Amino acid sequence: DLIMNSQLIWNLDAQFVFLGAGEARYERALLTLAKARPQHVGVQLDFTDRLEHRLMAGADMFLMPSQYEPCGLTQMRAQRYGSLPIGRRVGGIADTVHDDTTGFLFDEFRPAALDWCISRALTRFADPDAWAMRMDTAMQQDFGWERSAERYAQVYLQAIEIAKSRR
């Protein structure tokens, strides 16, 4: 409902590609929009990893207006390609996207909040040098296991020290 009720998305002179299957009512609505605005809306219901990667590689922004997102790897992959996520500040998106640096975040699950966030992103996009800097920062994010393992090791060592001090 968030995307379908957005005033900004459907009136922008921009292109949107929707990939993957979902609830039948949303699929029908998106396919109807794609027929009405073929130069602006593309819909591909059959998801493939290859197509996802190609879309990310060619996109300037990656829309992720999740109502909830327990982890989310998609925004991390998008950042690797320099496709800046526009997402709701929830779960894994909130943990991995830095607002106005490696992507753009909004809080309320309302179309007006999504529109505001897209508008902010488009304002930043209008400055090519600043946008390139954001893309570069996003592509340099380190979500690898080596860094995570080091952080876990630090937490375990701290826990051991605390346990020793309580003896």
Describe every region a protein language model picked out.
Residues 72-75, 93:
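Short glycine/serine-rich donor-binding loops of glycosyltransferases
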Residues 126-154:
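A charged, aromatic-enriched C-terminal amphipathic alpha-helix characteristic of glycosyltransferases
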Residues 49-58, 98, 113-115:
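Short acidic alpha-helix that forms the nucleotide-activated donor recognition element
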Residues 10-54:
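Nucleotide-activated donor-binding/catalytic signature segment of Leloir-type glycosyltransferases, i.e.
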